[in-house]
């Protein structure tokens, strides 16, 4: 079986001092880029999809595609529910075969966040499904969820331990100054906060909003305990811009098999760089 949960992947990363990248995909071509690049570099990767992606492509279609590509390349893959908020939606996808879940109740008060997450954990662990949850709240937009910068909240290290112990989660997404989307200027990450969280919580830690971060910042977060790096916007931007450029230069182009190649190539460069930044090449 080539489609797995993220639990062992992230535990291996925690022991090995590297991070596993979670790449948000949107269609066949973006999935091809991620899987082919990961297989060529022998790197562990996570195929992530927001609720919008699963609605667009269909859960059964995505699962079948991931399974087929994992088997084709003899490469273990995890398909992961990114920023899912509804219990019934998560339960349906788990019953369909998903083995890695992020339940995002970070917008709720602390006690309600715990309650919502624990409900999902109790259900998912019956199916050996790994669960990630978020404490604190990132600014920016992910799918249809918009969080103003003023409403973004950093993770409280002491609360993080209570949250992890009360919910039984397998990994914790932290808020230390990143945001969803691309940055107009380099963000000021709170490395001391991350170091403090690591002292209070022994679970694999997750960094969302990594698109556009410098190699130096990514590698510093890994040294301080980040085991999973989420990248979405940077992939979409590189793919879309290359496609726009190609069609502008070749207005006569009508065959997707031709004009999508430049988009895939541009995205492949981003995937390769993120894998290198995460230090996970050769770790699969």
Curated annotation (Swiss-Prot):
Q: Which residues bind dihydroxyacetone phosphate?
A: 181, 209-211, 230-233
Its Enzyme Commission number(s) read: 4.1.2.40
Q: Which domain of life is it from?
A: Bacteria
Annotated residues that bind Zn(2+) are located at 83, 180, 208
Enzyme's top EC category: lyase
Catalytic activity, per the record? D-tagatofuranose 1,6-bisphosphate = D-glyceraldehyde 3-phosphate + dihydroxyacetone phosphate
The free-text note explaining how the cofactor binds reads:
Binds 1 zinc ion per subunit.
Which protein family is it in?
A: Belongs to the class II fructose-bisphosphate aldolase family. TagBP aldolase GatY subfamily.
NCBIfam families registered for this protein in UniProt = cbbA (TIGR00167), PRK09195.1 (NF006626), PRK12737.1 (NF009374), tag_bisphos_ald (TIGR01858)
Protein's recorded name: D-tagatose-1,6-bisphosphate aldolase subunit GatY
Upper lineage ranks? Bacteria, Pseudomonadati, Pseudomonadota, Gammaproteobacteria, Enterobacterales
């Amino acid at each position: 079986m080539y489609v797995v949960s993220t639990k062992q992947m992230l535990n291996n990363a925690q022991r090995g001092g590297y991070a596993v990248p979670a790449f948000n995909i949107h269609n066949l071509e973006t999935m091809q880029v991620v899987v082919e690049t990961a297989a060529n570099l022998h790197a562990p990767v996570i195929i992530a999809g927001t609720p919008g992606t699963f609605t667009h492509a269909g859960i059964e279609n995505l699962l079948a595609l991931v399974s087929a590509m994992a088997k084709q390349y003899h490469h273990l893959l995890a398909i992961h529910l990114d920023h899912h908020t509804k219990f019934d939606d998560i339960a349906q996808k788990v019953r369909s075969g998903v083995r890695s879940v992020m339940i995002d109740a970070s917008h709720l008060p602390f006690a309600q966040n715990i309650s919502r997450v624990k409900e999902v954990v109790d259900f998912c662990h019956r199916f050996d499904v790994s669960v990630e949850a978020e404490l604190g709240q990132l600014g920016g937009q992910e799918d249809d969820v918009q969080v103003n910068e003023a409403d973004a909240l950093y993770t409280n290290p002491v609360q993080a331990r209570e949250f992890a112990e009360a919910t039984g989660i397998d990994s914790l997404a932290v808020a230390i100054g990143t945001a969803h989307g691309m940055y107009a200027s380099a963000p000021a990450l709170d490395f001391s906060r991350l170091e403090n969280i690591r002292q209070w919580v022994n679970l694999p830690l997750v960094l969302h909003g990594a698109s556009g971060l410098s190699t130096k910042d990514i590698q510093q977060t890994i040294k301080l305990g980040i085991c999973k790096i989420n990248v979405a916007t940077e992939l979409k931007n590189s793919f879309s811009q290359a496609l726009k450029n190609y069609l502008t230069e070749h207005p006569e182009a009508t065959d997707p098999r031709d004009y999508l190649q430049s988009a895939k190539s541009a995205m492949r460069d981003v995937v390769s760089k993120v894998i290198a930044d995460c230090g996970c090449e050769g770790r699969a």
